Amino acid sequence: MKQFTSLSRVPQAALAALILGAVLLPSSSSPAQADQPLPSINLPIEGWTVVALKKGFLQEEYNKLGTKVNLVDPGTTQLIGAESALLDRGGLAIAQRMIYPATVHKANGIDASIVWLSTKSSEYRTPVLALKSSGLNSIADLKDKNFGSSRVACGWTSPTEIFTAAGLPLDNARERGQVRYTNISNTVATSAALLSGRIDATSTHVALPDVAALIETDEVKVIGRSPADGVYVNNAGRVAYFVMREFVDAHPQAIVAFLRAREKTDAWINANVDEAAAIIAKETRIPVAIARFGITDPSSFQYMQGEPSSQVAVDAIKTFQKWYIDHGDDILSSRHLSDDTIESFVDKRFFKGGEYSVYQD
């Protein structure tokens, strides 16, 4: 069966409306029998998925199910959080975010399950950045300055811990802190705000193409990092793949196919970095040097090992949820997940020892 890539880009206003609808409307999912026919599946365009399609790893797995693969732009670079709307409306079968925003989506009413989690994050992934020419050299220099990032993302979770550790808390919905905070839900707009001086510093994934370009051109510098033993690195900064519960119950083998293809592709990319970077550059329209940076830099997040233990996943959510609530998280304070909900949020069938696990016992 022929495979093809479909690139779908949605206007920002439409994405915002979709997200609002995804949050406000209750889920109508109901139990379904496993392994229902699946003629096609929409997967997110990522560095590894474009390589997997080009090299045939996705086709190898999905041809066994008679399923055609479409790669779809999840819209996250246009509007952070867009993937939740696409997931809820059926435009995307599997979404990828860090575990904190995935948990916020769950708290906002998305009936989704985590089917894969990465091992712990890194202090290099989401540092605090300032312009090289700014004169700002440490977190202490940001007192009463303007910090901007995406609220429901690592651009908030990582710096919240960094600033708290430095005794300079960010503004939050409850009280004024010692650093002004602006929510900017677009990675390109965040970079533009930093370059134009509208904000003094930001925090985001260094491996994202627009941010990697600022690093490679020596326009920004790191002035603070997440504690290596902290809540972000060990818990909130883990990568998660999550799926609507109705879909995963109906098509568990489609999830297994995705996870198997990911493992094969990740191994191939690590062994063939230059060829992989060339494929990613061509398919996602970024410079080869930036594609290579996204693979090899310590901040990389798309090519991590999986966390086999479902208990570690459950404990990670419980740990970071409590920590952020204790430190002014207005979202999870009002809509936090119960222990029972967290237990069911992590679909143990896809972790080690589970019925659909890709991990060897």
Give each language-model segment a name:
Residues 2-15:
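Bacterial N-terminal signal peptides that target proteins for export
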Residues 28-33:
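Sec/Tat signal peptide C-region and signal peptidase I cleavage site
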Residues 35-184, 200, 206, 224:
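Short, glycine-/small- and polar/acidic-enriched structural segments
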Residues 59-69, 227-234, 301-314:
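Short, solvent-exposed loop/beta-turn-alpha elements that line the ligand-binding surface or hinge
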